Regions:
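Hydrophobic alpha-helical transmembrane bundles of multi-pass membrane proteins
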Residues: 1-211
Length: 211
């Protein structure tokens, strides 16, 4: 059973990984040609840097012991394996969680396409990979306060049950979506989107086939 669970987990991780090029193609198709390289590099870099940062720092914060944030065991998979103890190989579980983190990070890229400096996007990648995603993920998947089933816990006293997210609709997509909303609101529309009269102008993408 453990072997089958491991195979299924790695298969699911592979499918989630392919969301990364999927988002990249969607964004590249809906933007102008001059910004294609910038968007593709953002999607590549947030996966590369985000994976390394989550591996070294975020994973420990997300699955360490604690209510608000996990007590980290940085660079120590053996210690994390004893804490998580889900019957799955810790290396495979790390890969599985890493691609989820990368997906949450790359969701934001499309909402801020053509309006973000590459250097500032790298700063954002650091924050979501080592702080925002691990902390919010800890609340739901890492034993934090949202999944605390003790009789006197906040969730049990208030709702009579704990919070469940079976596939990342909140931990991954909602977190990425809220960050994207805030980023888009701060940045505002793309240059040239509105004329002096306030009317909206269409900015056609380069390829609906890619999108």
């Amino acid at each position: 059973a453990t072997g089958l669970n491991t195979v299924w987990m790695l298969l699911a991780a592979m499918l989630v990984f392919f969301m990364q090029p999927g988002f990249a193609l969607v964004e590249a198709g809906f933007i102008r040609t001059k910004n294609t390289a910038n968007v593709l590099m953002k999607n590549l870099v947030d996966f590369m840097f985000g994976s390394i940062l989550f591996w070294f720092i975020g994973f420990g914060l997300m699955f360490g012991i604690g209510g608000f944030v996990g007590a980290p065991h940085f660079f120590n998979l053996e210690a994390m394996d004893k804490i998580i103890d889900n019957g799955l190989p810790i290396e495979g579980f790390l890969i599985f969680q890493t691609v989820f983190c990368a997906t949450a990070a790359t969701i934001v890229s499309g909402a801020m396409a053509e309006r973000t400096k590459f250097s500032m996007y790298l700063v954002y990648t650091v924050f979501i990979s080592v702080l925002i995603y691990p902390v919010s993920g800890h609340w739901t998947w890492g034993g934090g306060w949202l999944m605390n089933g003790d009789e006197g816990s906040f969730m049990m006293r208030t709702f009579g049950t704990t919070f469940h997210d079976f596939a990342g609709s909140t931990v991954v997509h909602s977190v990425g979506g809220w960050i994207a909303l805030v980023g888009a609101a701060i940045l505002g529309p793309r240059i040239g989107k509105y004329g002096k009269d306030g009317k909206s102008r269409a900015i056609p993408g380069q390829s609906l086939t890619l999108a």
